[in-house]
Amino acid sequence: MLKQLKRLSLSLLLPVLAALTLTFAMPSMANDSVAAKSAEKEMTQLGGADFWRQVRAGEEGYTTSQSPEHGVLISTAGETWYVLKEKWMSPLGALAIFGSLAMVTLAYFTIGPLKLSKPKTGRRIQRWSKMDRALHWSMAFTFLTLAFSGLCLVYGKHFLKPILPTDIWGMIIYAAKQYHNYMGPIFGILLMTVLVKWWRKSIVNMTDIQWFLKMGGMVGKHKGSHPSAGFSNGGEKAIFWLLIWFGAIAAISGFVLDFPIFGQLRRDMELSNLIHMFSALILICGFIFHIYIGLFGMEAGLEGMVTGDVDETWAKEHHDLWYAEVKDLPENQPKDKNS
């Protein structure tokens, strides 16, 4: 009987305690809610429509920070940058890249590679030194990896992010950003080295104009004609100066983005970003054609940059003026098989 009374008293006590708790808690919760609403109302009244209109207009307010533009809550120019980058440059850049890939693919299957008109003789002509080849492949590796990491930063969110786990996507994009930031200055150094090393071989002359008029002997009525050329033909010189000019623009704008410690404002960074992206896209499209010619578009086109020398027939047909200059040099004489 005593146990039953204890259970009954406990069952009655618990609801009473709960009611008392709610009685004291509800006013407190209500007060908190009222205080929050009061604070929100006060903030709205303090800000007002005029305040937020000024914020949206990009007007600068007061702040204790002495850094430039720290008093600006909303950068109106940032919206313009976003639209130009995401709505125009990104899709047009993708179209240009895929268009370039489509063009070289079409060229391969319709025009085909440029073949040698005569058999190889086996006589080797020295063309590129070890230093030249090391510089070329260093630049090639740096450029291609920067292009890949840059494309990941611009287009990865459209193609990779939807199919990858969040953690893996985060690691990839972080690695791409860090690699791009640290490798960019190295690209600039290599670019200056390339300019100093090869600019004399890349001065355009009338022979190159004729080369362009005949479209390098690769298409049309001049296909297979092998127009005259010195050490570098018109196409190689065009690629060289494309690399130098747009590479310099990409390197300088990248430096501005890499080191925002020289008083750059938001608009400086936004403009540098657009210029950097535009110049990089031009370089990528240009080097799609360069890579195509080296790998697929010309017979033995890659030999010289791999081994350092080329076959005599290739030298005669593609760089006849240069061949005439170097054919009698001691290093280009046929090797005595018995020696």
Feature locations, PLM:
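Hydrophobic secretory-pathway targeting helix
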Residues: 1-30
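Membrane-embedded alpha-helical bundles that constitute the cytochrome b-like, heme-associated redox core
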Residues: 5, 27-339
